[in-house]
Amino acid sequence: MILTLTANPSLDRTIELGSPLAHGAVQRAVGAVQDPGGKGVNISRALHTSQVPTVAVVPGEATDPVLTALAASGVQFANLPTGEPIRSNITVVDPDGTTTKLNAPGTEFTPKLRDALDALVIAQSENADWVVLAGSLPGGLEATYYAELCAKLRASGYEGKIAVDTSEAPLIATVAGQIKPTLIKPNSEELAQLTGAENWEELESSPELTARTARTLVNDGIPYVL
């Protein structure tokens, strides 16, 4: 089983316009869809579609549209009640394909809520072959959160594999952490930032250089760098 954590889930709404977006105007949409979102949620949805057992850990009320949509699609989840609705992210699509994205802030985590999320992930990890910590972090969770959760999982006795799929400060903190994840997947720019490489564009154009650069992270204790 693959366990995913989406600390900052969202309800992703896409609105299609029949004319270009006009600031300050009232416009009618020609189409609209909404889906549960967040990296971990999307991973669990893809795994479920591929008939791979998965459980998605999601902060939010069981009656929230994100979680009812997961339930309706058959994705198993373990939710942490927060007393707040899950945020909505809105993408507006112009007729020529130009997109405008509006991302709302997520739930502000208190220390008590953070501890409860840690406990839920650890409890759900008992039967997991992989634990995937994915996506951005909401307010109240520091950049070191994923690194600290990796350490807590190992301290709890979890012996499976841990993947971290994030970016910017949380990724840097994860790589710098004492307890390393099993797998990370930085892009070329992030790989350069993590290793001190001078030109990420050179990595983008050279698979051989990328492999050599990624090897430095493998040598530092991360078995798989994709």
Identify what each model region corresponds to.
Residues 1-3, 100, 129-130, 183, ...:
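Structural motif
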Residues 25, 48-129:
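Conserved N-terminal subdomain of the carbohydrate kinase-like
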Residues 148-226:
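Conserved phosphate/ATP/ADP-binding segment of small-molecule kinases
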Residues 107-110, 137-141, 170-172, 192-193:
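Short, small-residue-enriched loops and turns at beta-alpha junctions
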Residues 101-103, 128-136, 185-188:
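Short beta-strands and strand-loop turn motifs
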Residues 110-153, 159-160:
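Hydrophobic alpha-helical segments and helix pairs
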Residues 1-55:
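Glycine-rich phosphate/adenosyl-contacting loop at the front of the ribokinase-like
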Residues 5, 58, 78-79, 133, ...:
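General beta-strand structural signal in soluble alpha/beta enzymes
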